[in-house]
A protein has these predicted regions:
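Membrane translocator/pore-forming domains, dominated by Gram-negative outer-membrane beta-barrels
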Residues: 2-255
């Protein structure tokens, strides 16, 4: 039998556009964002019993470049991000904590279609390359030394959501602007909802890890692999509060 895991996550993000211009029939937008999030993964043993839980609290800073073809709506999103992690693994009243740093680069594209005046469907394709370095740590059972890990992912899916006074044809990092720079009441804010189911294929995952106890000769080194296919479901709400500021909340489930 093979151990199984399932997890969930949620985060909030604040982003702002720095430059918006038109180039050769395309709309170009660049900007920066900050995010804070929490994820939790439950691990089951071979017999289906609970083996432990891994939690991660993270804060991120990143930048984005968005290109939209004016006539067709086809878009491409390029994102670069750095993240600080605070992780905790719990099992049988034993806790292990570690801090670390991560990075991520992403290229995403999509093409929106109108179903109704206020409902859009958008097929999407995304490539992601990410890396993570964690500090060494120990718990009651022994020590763990982490190396640098990295992995690549390809995501295929679609986004279904409302279209309320906000351009839908963009990726996860940028949004079009409104004519009015400020809304004066909550009821006036353009708020959109969306759901995004996807299939994710992970490949070229690398990373060495060693662990052991104080006993001589107990050290073991192995290279866990994350290669495989997973299902992902995300949902969120977004509101434009100023001409170049979007507030959003997002949650997801992966298996």
């Amino acid at each position: 039998a093979t151990p199984e895991s399932s997890g969930s996550y949620g985060f909030v993000r604040l982003e702002g556009d720095l430059l918006r211009t038109e180039v050769a029939g395309m709309s170009l937008t660049t900007g920066v964002y900050g995010a804070a999030g929490h994820s939790s993964v439950d691990v089951k043993d071979d017999d289906g019993s609970r083996a432990g839980t891994v939690r991660d609290d993270a804060g991120s800073l990143g930048g984005y470049l968005n290109l939209v073809h004016t006539s067709s709506g086809l878009w491409a999103d390029i994102v670069a991000q750095g993240t600080r992690h605070s992780m905790k693994a719990s099992s049988d009243n034993n806790d292990f904590r570690a801090r670390g740093r991560g990075w991520q680069g992403s290229l995403e594209t999509g093409l929106p279609f109108s179903i109704t005046d206020n409902l859009m469907l958008e097929p999407q394709l995304q490539y992601t390359w990410q890396g993570l370095s964690l500090d060494d740590g120990q718990d009651n059972a022994g020590y763990v030394k982490f190396g640098h890990g990295s992995a690549q992912h390809v995501r295929a899916g679609f986004r279904l959501g409302s279209h309320n006074d906000m351009t839908f044809g963009e990726g996860t990092s940028s949004r079009d602007t409104l004519r009015d720079s400020t809304k004066h009441g909550v009821s006036e804010l353009p708020v959109n909802w969306w759901v995004q189911p996807s299939v994710i294929r992970t490949f070229s995952s690398r990373g060495d890890m060693s662990m052991g106890t104080a006993a001589a000769g107990s050290n073991m080194t192995f290279s866990p692999s994350r290669n495989g296919t997973s299902l992902d479901l995300q949902a969120g709400l977004e509101a434009r509060v100023r001409e170049n500021i979007t507030l959003g909340v997002q949650a997801g489930y992966a298996h």
